[in-house]
Amino acid sequence: MPNWLLPENIADVLPSEARKIEELRRLIIDNFHLYGYELVMPPMLEYLESLLAGAGHDMDLRTFKLIDQLSGRTLGVRADMTTQVARIDAHLLNRASITRLCYCGSVLQTRPNGLHATREPLQIGAEVYGHGGLEADAEIQELALASLALAGFTQVRIDLCHVGVLRAIIASDVQAQKDENALYTFLRAKDVPALQEMTLTYGADTRRALLALPGLYGDVTVIARAREILPKLPGIDTALDELIALAGLAGETSVTIDLADLGGYQYESGVMFAIYVPGLPNAVARGGRYDHVGEAFGRARPATGFSMDLRELARLLPDAEPKLAIRAPWGREPALRTKIGALRKAGEIVIQSLSGHENDQDEFECDRVLVLEDGNWIIKNLG
């Protein structure tokens, strides 16, 4: 096997793509700061039990594991940063007030999330801790849409769901409670035949409601249909009320309701959303409420947030034009060094030519040149 081959769904990021990613990261992180979010940087790996606390079986399957040579304990390489940030809020910051945190870093996953997806996403996201009301969910939804707008994605669709619907349906059926994980899997895949077979021994109302969920998809009128079809349970009524409220706060953004889109069900506790852009089957951003994750770290706090993959977003953007730069000769003369330093301080890209490589600049377009005239270094236009 050639030494330059990488594992499947793992890839290097080359200069033009890296520039798009970094510029986008700066835009989004700076915008988070304008909303009052503080940046945190969790470690790449942790003890496995801490990393998976409250995260569910699906996250366990997606996590790479290794043995710590110092302690002999099992470590996990983070596959998602959400629980790490929840640990920071619950255990390290330990604030009583509302806390807004943001983050950006690479995660590593045993399997890709979708066709042609990377197993090393560059995850960026934001979380609000300490407020259980819809105001926090609305802020996170607004921030996610604003982040995508900064990347140039304004024609997006937000897909809303609520885990409270499924949990209310199965709460009164003992057999359904035993099959909760399988039901989640079948509903997420909209596998109606499997649902029909699994629910044969359930109560009639439970079975009817579960089989209806995959078809409860469409615009906001789906909520009215759900009120007619689903059992009259307080948990369902509350969930549908929250969905209609958040749908009304989306402004001009296209909104769909999908009561079977249960990504993250195992640790989410309320509203969930996924945001899609035209021409791409997978969501570019996902978020929702997860009030119980902090319990694993000894401090339950209301929490809601979202995340997205910067590498995926950058891949969707058009190739950037080469940066304009100034070409300068190589030299250590004090006057030349002073002039180059002043230009760089002013924000100009100045590239010093090495002997025999004066025109070798793939990533930059040198439209000006620094020349010595009458004892002064001046800039002249090229072409």
Swiss-Prot record:
Compartment annotation: Cytoplasm
Species for this entry: Herminiimonas arsenicoxydans
Role played: Required for the first step of histidine biosynthesis. May allow the feedback regulation of ATP phosphoribosyltransferase activity by histidine.
InterPro entries for this protein: aa-tRNA-synth_II/BPL/LPL, HisRS-like_core, HisRS/HisZ, HisZ
Main location class: cytoplasm
Keywords annotated in UniProt: Amino-acid biosynthesis, Cytoplasm, Histidine biosynthesis
GO BP annotations listed: histidyl-tRNA aminoacylation; L-histidine biosynthetic process
Pfam families named among the record's database cross-references: tRNA-synt_His
Keyword presence, Oxidoreductase: no
Protein known as: ATP phosphoribosyltransferase regulatory subunit
UniProt similarity note: Belongs to the class-II aminoacyl-tRNA synthetase family. HisZ subfamily.
Quaternary structure and interacting proteins, as annotated: Heteromultimer composed of HisG and HisZ subunits.
GO CC annotations on file: cytoplasm
Pathway assignment: Amino-acid biosynthesis; L-histidine biosynthesis; L-histidine from 5-phospho-alpha-D-ribose 1-diphosphate: step 1/9
GO molecular function per UniProt: histidine-tRNA ligase activity
Further facts: This function is generally fulfilled by the C-terminal part of HisG, which is missing in some bacteria such as this one.
